Amino acid sequence: MMQPVLELLGIDRTYHTAAGALQVLQGTDLRVSPGELVGLVGPSGSGKSTLLHTAGLLERPEGGSIFLDGIDCLKLNDNGRTSIRRRKIGFVYQFHHLLPEFNAIDNIAMPLMIAGVKKSKAREKASSLLEVMGLEERAYHQPGQLSGGEQQRVAIARALANDPKLVIADEPTGNLDPTTTERVFGTLIKMVREEGAGVLVATHNFALTRHMDRILTLKDGKLIDYVE
């Protein structure tokens, strides 16, 4: 049986507010296999972002286990989890979060250089990703000189620079028109399928869900199959 790239087991996550304790995740289980696209839908406030942050090792749950590429992540210290996150997870957000003072190629190369890759090698990898994205002629343009769709394709390339095992996408096409959405998301799907990465996508755009292998929603802190 193929080892999942992500496995959440019995995850509990509670926020403490002035109004009292709010349990967002309650014994939540999730498995994402290599090359699998899993969609997460539901209304705002249902816990989608909390689930993504937990899966991405950005938040620590009160209970449960997180296995990423077979590694028991909650047994690691903060530095260990940070290292795993940088090496094995790629993030794509609704807003591209590109560094405005750097051009496209250096924005993509940045995660590689942070991971210790030499600048020349990092730029070589970034250049090949730009070519796949159809943006080789935009390599030395800063984010402000790119269209919204181009910015998001650069952000996707940056997320894939370290050859992650898992890609986490939070409303990745939320700011794009339908035509650009199809192109950008289609590129993401093609690349992760080729690399065998698992993908967890939270979206309000039901047009994207037709690309998913599974569609889930959160109800009472647990993941269930989404039924239209």
Swiss-Prot record:
Residues that bind ATP: 42-49
Topological relation to the membrane, as annotated: Peripheral membrane protein
Source taxon at top rank: Bacteria
Subcellular location(s) per record: Cell inner membrane
Keywords: ATP-binding, Cell inner membrane, Cell membrane, Membrane, Nucleotide-binding, Translocase, Transport
Residue span, ABC transporter domain: 6-227
GO molecular function: ATP binding; ATP hydrolysis activity; transmembrane transporter activity
Entries under InterPro entries matching the protein: AAA+_ATPase, ABC_transporter-like_ATP-bd, ABC_transporter-like_CS, ABC_transpr_LolD-like, MacB-like_ATP-bd, P-loop_NTPase
Coiled-coil ranges (or none): none
Keyword Nucleus: no
Gene Ontology CC: plasma membrane
Pfam families from the UniProt entry: ABC_tran
Example GO BP: protein localization to outer membrane
Enzyme class: translocase
Record flagged with keyword DNA-binding: no
EC number: 7.6.2.-
Family (UniProt): Belongs to the ABC transporter superfamily. Lipoprotein translocase (TC 3.A.1.125) family.
Role played: Part of the ABC transporter complex LolCDE involved in the translocation of mature outer membrane-directed lipoproteins, from the inner membrane to the periplasmic chaperone, LolA. Responsible for the formation of the LolA-lipoprotein complex in an ATP-dependent manner.
Record's subunit section: The complex is composed of two ATP-binding proteins (LolD) and two transmembrane proteins (LolC and LolE).
Protein name as catalogued: Lipoprotein-releasing system ATP-binding protein LolD
Species of origin: Hyphomonas neptunium (strain ATCC 15444)
